[in-house]
Amino acid sequence: WDQFMNSALGKQMTPHAVFEYVNTNSTNSATHQLCWFSDDPAKLEANQGIFASAKFMELFPVVNTYINNVTEISNYMGQSLIADPGDFNLRFSVLYGINVQDPVSYAGAFTKMKAAFDKRESTGTIELHEIIAGGEQGITHVVIVRAPSMAEWLSGRNEFIQTKAFQEFAAATRPYTDVIQTTSGRPLQFYNVQ
């Protein structure tokens, strides 16, 4: 994969990350995730054209390695609703796959809670992403909490879940939100990120 992403063709693709799952309660057996991101939907669509191109097929060793060593378990199209790509490089993350029955109310409560989260002294970020198509059964949104390390993530979590802002968020969203899965992990490699 590294060979492809460092080729002239790979450098034409949008930024993406290779993410390794560490702990998960998901029912699927995925161990890694490839995640492409861009603010420009046309550029994301162009990625598909690259994979379907004759030039990509000329990279037979890469294609053959992928075919022989990777089993695609799931794929989805999502959109970042509240996220800062500048924080994607933080080294430890927990992803909460959730089912939200009232997205408007959830977004309002999330925005209020995030404002309190961002005022903390700790390093880290919290994001909200929408699952538009594909993905795991019942998951409509993903909340990602990132920190520089697992130790910092746990310390920040233990502190923040006791705050009034988090308690109000949890109480407000509980009637229309179900957490379906949690997954921890870390980015292994970023490509085409400036």
Please place each PLM-identified region on the residue numbering.
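Short S/T/G/P-rich N-terminal loop/turn motif that feeds into the first structured element of a domain
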Residues: W1-Q194
